[in-house]
From Swiss-Prot:
Protein name: Small ribosomal subunit protein bS20
Flavoprotein in keyword set: no
Lineage: Bacteria, Pseudomonadati, Pseudomonadota, Gammaproteobacteria, Alteromonadales
InterPro entries named in the record: Ribosomal_bS20, Ribosomal_bS20_sf
Chain positions covered by the region annotation Disordered: 1-27
Function in brief: Binds directly to 16S ribosomal RNA.
Record GO biological process: translation
GO cellular component terms given for this protein: cytosol; small ribosomal subunit
Family, similarity comment: Belongs to the bacterial ribosomal protein bS20 family.
GO molecular function, one term: structural constituent of ribosome
SUPFAM superfamilies the UniProt entry points to: Ribosomal protein S20
Keywords from the UniProt entry: Ribonucleoprotein, Ribosomal protein, RNA-binding, rRNA-binding
Key word RNA-binding present: yes
Organism: Shewanella sp. (strain ANA-3)
Length: 88
């Protein structure tokens, strides 16, 4: 339990940031799941559109520090490869 005034403030800030990050992480997962669902359905057009919407979100989360930039690149590369395989 936080005893000093500054420790209490830091605890409040930490909780606020945790909730904000959880919301953003959930949004990121939702966008990625939409792409995966379209790929599993075999719908190339929908998958491409969902990927186009998800790509800037993934990049933004990497910029904000929510996920590592390499993880963002890996997400995008793997999803894009699956979409290209769907077209072939």
């Amino acid at each position: 339990m936080a005893n000093s005034k500054s420790a209490k403030k830091r605890a409040l800030q930490s909780e606020k940031r945790r909730q904000h990050n959880a919301s953003r992480r959930s949004m990121l997962r939702t966008y990625v799941k939409k792409v995966i669902a379209a790929i599993k359905a075999g719908d190339h057009k929908t998958a491409t559109e969902a990927f186009a919407a998800a790509q800037p979100i993934v990049d933004r989360m990497a910029t904000k520090g929510l996920i590592h930039k390499n993880k963002a690149a890996r997400h995008k590369a793997r999803l894009n490869a699956k979409i290209k395989a769907l077209a072939a």
